[in-house]
């Protein structure tokens, strides 16, 4: 891909060597890169939608996101802090929202956390240290929270899995800014996800059933 952009390799050469599939993906990556260079404002939802339509093949966007995740993991040791900041800002306003749009929530969180690490270094490590210090008690609390919910859902005859997770560092930082408080002022540090194993025709009904059970317990 980089070789094509620099003129060291031709798309048609890739077509001959690897077939239409690979050539079309390369062509899509080049088109998206050209669009990116020509567009002055890329922080908007309109640009993200335009980029998705230009890509045509969704694999193009997946490669772009994967490439940015890889780059974000590697730039921590670069001496060029200005370039590091630019890459982190792009990850925050373009690639993380794209990952969210495609349902790649884990990658979205990783991109946001790494962006915060480079853009707001002190805030990132403050929150990380606080989370590490409270991990044991938080994990125990999550287990205590999940148990009665699991019992009620099982009594209702539902098939399900419950997962508890600590919210991302970026998410907590956003709450701290919005509420204008320190880490200790944020109480919703974790989230619970209930995943139903239900037939398609009963999905909606059982989702509402779970919602009703949980709200009855915690209203």
Language-model segments: what does each one mean?
Residues 1, 67:
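Short, conserved catalytic/metal-binding micro-motifs enriched in Asp/Glu and His
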Residues 2-55:
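Metal-dependent phosphohydrolase cores
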Residues 34-61, 68-219:
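Nucleic-acid processing machinery
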């Amino acid at each position: 891909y980089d070789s094509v952009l620099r003129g060291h390799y031709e798309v048609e050469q890739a077509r001959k060597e690897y077939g239409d599939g690979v050539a079309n993906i390369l062509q899509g990556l080049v088109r998206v890169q050209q669009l990116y260079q020509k567009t002055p404002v890329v922080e908007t939802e309109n640009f993200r939608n335009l980029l998705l339509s230009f890509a045509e093949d969704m694999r193009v966007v997946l490669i772009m996101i994967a490439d940015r995740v890889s780059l974000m993991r590697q730039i921590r040791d670069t001496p060029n802090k200005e370039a590091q900041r630019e890459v982190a800002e792009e990850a925050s306003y373009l690639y993380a929202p794209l990952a969210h749009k495609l349902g790649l929530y884990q990658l979205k969180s990783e991109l946001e956390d790494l962006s915060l690490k480079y853009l707001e270094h002190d805030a990132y490590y403050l929150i990380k240290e606080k989370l590490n210090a409270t991990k044991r008690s938080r994990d125990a609390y999550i287990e205590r929270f999940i148990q009665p919910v699991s019992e009620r859902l099982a009594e209702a005859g539902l098939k399900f899995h419950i997962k508890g997770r600590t919210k991302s560092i970026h998410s907590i930082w956003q709450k701290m800014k919005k509420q204008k408080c320190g880490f200790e002022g944020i109480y919703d540090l974790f989230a619970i996800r209930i995943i139903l194993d239900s037939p398609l025709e009963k999905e909606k009904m059982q989702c509402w059933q779970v919602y009703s059970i949980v709200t009855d317990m915690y209203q």
